[in-house]
Amino acid sequence: METGMNRKRSRSKRANSNVGVEKDKEKEKSKGVSNVPNEVETESSSHEPSFKKDVDEEIPSLTAELSEEEEGEYSSESGRSTPELSPDDFEDADDEEEFEEIDAGYSSDSSTEDVAPGLYESPYDENLYINYDIDGKKITRPATPAALDSLIASIDKDKGWTGIVDPMTGKPVNLTTEELGLLKRLAQSEIPDENFDPYPDYDDFFTNTVRETPLSSAPEPKRRFAPSKHEQKRILQLAYAIRKGRILTSEQRAERERESQSNYADHDLWADDDQATVNQRKLDYAPAPKLPPPSHEESYNPPEEYLKQSSDFPKKYKSLRVVPAYSNLIKEKFERCLDLYLAPRVRRTKLNIDPESLLPKLPTPSELRPFPTRCTNVFIGHKGRVRCLSVHVSGNWLASGGDDGVLRIWEVMTGRCVWKCSLDSFGNAHNIDSDEDAVNESLSHSTKSSIIQSLAWGPLSDSPVLAVAVDETVYFITPPIFSDEQIEASKELFTSAPYQESSAIWRRGAKQSLQLHGGIVHATVSTPSSIKSLSWHRRGDYLATSSPTSSSQAVLIHQLSRGASQSPFSKSKGSVQAVTFHPTMPYLLVATQRYVRIYNLVKQELVKTLLTGVKWVSSLSVHSSGDHVIIGSYDKRLCWFDLDFSSKPYKNLRYHSRALRDVSYHPSLPLFCSGSDDGDVQVFHGRVYSDLLANPLIVPLKILRNHKVVDNVGVLSTCWHPKEAWLFSAGAGGEIRMWT
């Protein structure tokens, strides 16, 4: 009932409002006043009868009750306004028609949609008005812009322009800045509310900061620090019980259990037989080796250029389905069966050996001191390359010579040049006090270049003699830096006997007027060819020289006491590069380009030939014990030979990047070094044991740098101090360095 009454009331209200609207129209017509243009009024009047007809049909009782007097009373002529009707005026109508309630389905129009207040959708889109307001007046449709205005409006866009017209109001829809920002955030899948922070700052309620203030300010009780008396009593009780035997330890309990089991154990007579049967059943079969997997070395359809000329394989097939079966399959299977049947297989356990354990454990360099580590002094004075060095037996004097033909004597401790002289290739000697121009003058007057190839101090400290090789001449000189007693003792080495005819020409210093100012030239020896190396015998009476360019007199041995020279070989086997005496035996070591031969001078026979395995030997040095030899080569290798072990190298050391020029052993310490064209001097520790079963210990110690490389030539000569772990090196830069 309530639904029907509400529906009646709504129809009454709508009818009442429509009647009021019609009367207002009649009054406006009677007065001749119009609120709209003629065209609009004419068009609207054409639609009024249909609207009026609908109202009359809906409310038939309303038109019947109105009388002519009431029409005259409320006409437009009387000037009165139309009274407003309330819904109560239509409640008593008997002829009111009731309609069934309309149920709007899913496919029907959305009549319940929310619209703007006071407006509803008009079904008359072609009318000039679009709706009625709350007073029942017409709401005129806004004027539609022309095409030109629309174009201008699309160019001059307002702020927030969208290009959408609201169908309710007919006006363009403009968006605010907040709405544009909201749409932008939604399009970028962001949070719509810009004030919302999805990642707020983390507030660590439980920090790692230790609070200094305690929860309770009460002081710590004494029982926290004093040992517990109750625990002490309990420990005493347990200790007393253990001593009395009332409490057993775990070891005592285990021992008692073993004793009880041994006392009551039953002996099984057949235990060993069963174990033997079990062991017999478990045979250790070695699995057969697996077949190799198929390979892809050959193609069934290779290109033409890969086909062999022979009739063997590979053969070419057009497709894989025409490839025949393998012809040797049965043969290979049969051979495999024979191998599995006849060939024994052994199971070998794999040895897991750490590779580090196979390497020898070398001591650290700090444990092998002393050895040279830094440059403490530089001797500067030579012009050009310094080719040879030699230290006196006392260790106080250093002799050097080079391409400038000047012999210089240096004081080791101070680095001062105490004496120097220029030697030419004609057997003349010129003294040079302190003028360097005299050196250049003497070199310019000589018709042949004077290059000091080698020099060596004699092994006798009481009779100091320096042997200097300049081209084909050997000078025996005593510099004026020694005492008179030492000088007289050195003279006696050359005046004990007259000179004899030999392979070389001997001349006394006094006859040839080779007496230098302050120094003495005892004798000169002229050989047929240029001399490359010198080597003194340990007794100081013999000197060996080598000449690579000579064949019959490549090696000469000069005896100072007799004043004679002899050639131990009628013809040399190759170009002799270096020669040296054995330190303990009457042996002579001769190094050619690829071999080192050891000769017994007493028996005049070949003792051993060392197979170096290098292309060109450059230098040679013998250990003080005489059982070990090292050589340097131009192919960047240093070879260590153990004469008691083998004729092949015991160790091949290849640490330099260029050719080796010189190698040398220390006279008394377990050290040896090598100088190379890369400008480096490498120092090694080489300890030799008296036990023949122990191998020598070789440890790299230090790389000494700072030598200049001139025209691809670096270090040319090295020599050790006879007592200290000091090393002297000379190179192509014209400087001599002392390493300590």
UniProtKB/Swiss-Prot annotation:
Q: Which residues carry this modification: Phosphoserine?
A: 434
Q: Looking at the UniProt record for this protein, which Gene Ontology cellular component terms does it annotate, in alphabetical order?
A: nucleolus; nucleoplasm; nucleus; PeBoW complex; preribosome; preribosome, large subunit precursor
Query: Biased composition, Basic residues: where in the chain?
Result: 1-14
Q: Where is the composition biased (Basic and acidic residues)?
A: 21-31, 44-55, 252-270
Gene Ontology annotations of biological process type = assembly of large subunit precursor of preribosome; maturation of 5.8S rRNA from tricistronic rRNA transcript (SSU-rRNA, 5.8S rRNA, LSU-rRNA); maturation of LSU-rRNA from tricistronic rRNA transcript (SSU-rRNA, 5.8S rRNA, LSU-rRNA)
Gene3D superfamilies, A to Z: YVTN repeat-like/Quinoprotein amine dehydrogenase
Give UniProt keywords alphabetically: Nucleus, Phosphoprotein, Repeat, Ribosome biogenesis, rRNA processing, WD repeat
What InterPro entries does the entry give? BOP1/Erb1, BOP1_N_dom, WD40/YVTN_repeat-like_dom_sf, WD40_repeat_CS, WD40_repeat_dom_sf, WD40_rpt
Query: Where are the residues of the annotated region Disordered?
Result: 1-121, 251-304
**HAMAP family noted in UniProt:** BOP1
Q: What does this protein do?
A: Component of the NOP7 complex, which is required for maturation of the 25S and 5.8S ribosomal RNAs and formation of the 60S ribosome.
PANTHER family membership: RIBOSOME BIOGENESIS PROTEIN BOP1, RIBOSOME BIOGENESIS PROTEIN BOP1 BLOCK OF PROLIFERATION 1 PROTEIN
Name the chain's protein: Ribosome biogenesis protein erb1
Source organism per UniProt: Schizosaccharomyces pombe (strain 972 / ATCC 24843)
Gene of origin?
erb1
